[in-house]
Amino acid sequence: MFGSRIGKKFTYKAGLRGEMSRVTLDSRHDNISQTDYTFFLAPSLSGIYDIADGHELSLAVSRRIGRPTYPQLNPYMSMIDATTYEKGNMHLQPEKATKLDLGYSLSRGSFNLFLNGYVNHTSDYISQITAIDSQRLITTYVNAASDLKSGVDFTLRVNPVKWMNVSLAANTYYVSTSGEYEGAEISNKGVTNNSNVLFDFLPWKGGDIQCQYFVSTPQYFPQLTTSLTHQMNVGFKQRFLKGAMTASILLTDVFKTAKWEVSSHNNIFDLTNISRNKSRMLWFGFSYNFNSFKQKADQKTESDRSLIRLGL
């Protein structure tokens, strides 16, 4: 990794990472024994340009490799319900993605705006696919030809009055997946938007009331398309004893509108699934901080090299 500054406004970082992997597949049941070697080269480049005070442009280009997980590789079948089974695919290949991000941020006092446009192309995309076998639905995983996702992230935070903060976030993108496996079409495409708005009220000292609304338009997955869904959560938090003790309450899906509705119409089968999870829940929380230690301004912190960590 190398980084430098050009003039007073532009800084950049560039890097190159190479990775050699060896995968050994040994199955006595299927009489298979083979070893594959893969070399992956991952360059990266990022830069930040200070347009003016509070205005900033950023650019990032990167590559990554995503390897299949154990459930995706496990070739033995497991039952999900009376008619649906799942099995992995031990011949899955890693997926390789290239991503380009272009961002803009504006910060002026209580007003903060962030925009990010992105394009992400993935080859050998690891995709879930469902087929019919003897009146059973068999779900497995395959490598689709490609997956393309491009869109815009938008985040806005404002503080109109001292006792209220408002945050608005939205992610709008176009996705297109293409591929075919043993006669089954796994292609799908469409435009999706995921948005949420948060109102944070501070009515009195130590009190915090939050109201958040989520909206998701239809999502497009290989073989599957979901319907629009939305829900609202409301929460309250109160701090006591100079912040050492906190009591909180949260009610999710206030109007009980969250649902999971999926449809699939392909050359193998037609499927419509409508289900509703236990999305409306009432949570109570209580916490107390016994250690209110505050580090002095001139006290040195431990470096990563001198700090011994236990666990993750």
Language-model regions, residue ranges each:
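Surface-exposed extracellular loop regions of Gram-negative outer-membrane beta-barrel proteins
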Residues: 1-30, 38-44, 48, 53-99, 119-139, 163-174, 219, ...
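Residue-level signature of outer-membrane beta-barrel architecture
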Residues: 4-6, 47-51, 63, 106, ...
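Repeated loop/turn-to-beta-strand initiation elements of outer-membrane beta-barrel proteins
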Residues: 9-12, 54-57, 110-113, 162-166, ...
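Transmembrane beta-strands of outer-membrane beta-barrel pores
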Residues: 18-24, 61-67, 106-108, 119-123, ...
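Conserved C-terminal beta-signal and adjacent last beta-strands/turns
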Residues: 45, 189-312
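Outer membrane beta-barrel strand-and-loop segments of large Gram-negative receptors
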Residues: 89, 93, 99, 108, ...
